[in-house]
Amino acid sequence: MNKQILRNVILAGLFLVPFIPFLVSSSFFFPFITTKAFAWMIIEEIIFATWILLALIDVDSRPKKSTILYAVLSFLVVIGLADLLGVAPIKSFWSNFERMEGFITLLHLGMFFAVVSSVFNEIDWKKWWNTSLAASFLLVLYCLLQIIGLKTINQGGVRVDGTLGNSIYLAVYMLFHIFIALLFMWRERQKTFLRWVYGLLILSQASILYYTATRGAILGLLGGILIAALLNIRNKEDRLVRKISIACLVALVVLVGGFSVVKDSAFIESSPVLARFSNLNLDSIKSQGRYFVWPMAWEGVKERPILGWGQENFSYVFQEHYRPEMFNLEPWFDRAHNIFLDWAVAGGFLGLLSYLALYLALMLSIWKSSAGFSYTEKSILTGLIAAYFFHNFFVFDNLVSYVLFFSLLAYVNSRVSGEKSSVQPVVESYKKNIVLPIVVILAALSLYFVNIKPMMTNIFLIDALKSVQTPGQIPAATEYFKKAYSTSRLGRPEVLEHLSANSVPIFSSDISMEEKNSFFTFTKDALLKETGGLDKDARHQLMVGSFLSTTGFLDEALIRLDKAKALIPNKQQIYFEMGAVYINKGELPKALEVFREAYELAPGYVEARVIYLIGAIYAGERVIENEMIAKISEREVVFDDRIIQAYNSNGRKNEVVSLLESRIRLDPANADTYRKYIEEVTK
């Protein structure tokens, strides 16, 4: 084993990491997440295996004992134990395609930390951070193309998201790099050209941060600058820095004070970014998901305070404490949108403390004299930590921000002096005959089962979804679905979800009855098989119930829907599904009763009113029907096809004609179409 070759392999892999944010492939399901995650994990597994071999022959490449190292190990151990003892250990380990986190990601972050903190010296770090800054500038250029309209903003709207697919993810990426650029601008302050390069880079990054319109990150930036400036007021090493810090404090006061004065002006209201700050008040907060999910998360922490629920299990807390007033928010939350609450839910107070210990260890190490940072550098890095900390109060982390955070941990760790964890030489024959084969075999197995097979599942799933939408490709779609389900455990929740969701177009296609029966049997077996491990997952029970209802197994559907209702009793969607089953069974009074329960959960929910009205029409309850019509706007009644269908099914043609005539009055542009419908009804 050649030490230099091994080191070069590791360096090559590490210097690819800054460019991972650019990776997006439409061949993958959740392309902005999975493309980056698979590439990163493959790189980490290769360089970690290489590093194991290097550490055997090079004592200098072995990790050194440090506060940060112990904090990282403690975090991994505590969260690993929490996942193992949590409500869904397999789910906690693998996560899903939408997030690509779970304990498997934490293990890779630990591997990344071990390698980069042991191998990089100060020169390597300088090159690596500057490579990352160069990559951030390329991303700035891409975002500029989005701003001027030459590139599409992936999430829609006006908030730029670059190649990360989410403006919040882009914001924290820019936030990190602003402070790193500031750090290097200070170090290179004597070189005019570099000072200008870093300065312009900071301005460009800050501009993109502004166009993300991410309040948490922007306020985090201001807060980070505030902390750095306050610290530098006591800077005895450089008078100029003290003066600049005072100027920054004055500028912040003027900025905040000035904004509060003009926040209601037409200029502010016309700005999509500034308006998000001016409209931030108690009423707007009450309409956000965080207003509801933060108290939910706290209740979940109190229920399992020591080691929590395990990663990826916030959904169990959500369903237990769901409030019916949340009907106008996204239907399912899998995060608390506060990283500290998320870790408290996932790992209990021990998990939260182990996560906070990472920040504490980082701060202590930065301010250690052995780290060799100047006072100004310490202040800048502390400002970065403060900015990131504040930002995380309102969001959850993603792979890119995790990598940047662990890079910072590794960088500071490499600056702190400490003795190597081991300096014992390893016998040559032991290295060649035992360690080398074991490392190669384990690396190959990991690459195959952790990356290759899940990637195959991911591609099979996206191919299945494309085939469903392509005429004549339904047979191919069914085969892709089967392959996606059987290939890998990672991504199976999404496979099951889309198996169920796409059953109707497959069953209504022109494939043979034998093929339909085969697909039905496969889908039903897959859904019911997974139900054993997801017995307490309300969303899965609802999905199974909906599938069984769609395919005509009404009694079995009610069993699953009753289970879902017991798990999340305040979710109106489940009541709607149950009522539809009762209507299909001809048990109209039961359907009306279920719809009434859904309506009474949140009388302000317009959809619940409409559904209750439909139930009353089917059940022939005219009093309830008239009561609900009085509570729904005319347009909502007139243009809802479900209401017309209910009247038509009950033979009430006069009401159907009346609604269609109202459509002619309210929508004269399509009057001819409505007249044709009237003719068909009155034949």
Label each region the model flagged:
Residues 259-272, 432-472, 490, 494-495:
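Hydrophobic alpha-helical transmembrane segments in integral membrane proteins
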Residues 550, 584-585, 618-619, 649, ...:
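Register position in tetratricopeptide repeats
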Residues 116, 166, 282-283, 289-333, ...:
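TM-adjacent membrane-interface loops and short helices in multi-pass inner/ER membrane proteins
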Residues 484, 529-530, 563-564, 597-598, ...:
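Canonical positions in the second alpha-helix
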Residues 2-4, 8-27, 41-53, 72-86, ...:
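Alpha-helical transmembrane segments of multi-pass inner-membrane proteins
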Residues 159-160, 224-225, 240-243, 256-302, ...:
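Flexible juxtamembrane loops connecting transmembrane helices in multi-pass membrane enzymes
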Residues 449-470, 482-512, 533-550, 570-577, ...:
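Amphipathic alpha-helical repeat scaffolds of TPR domains
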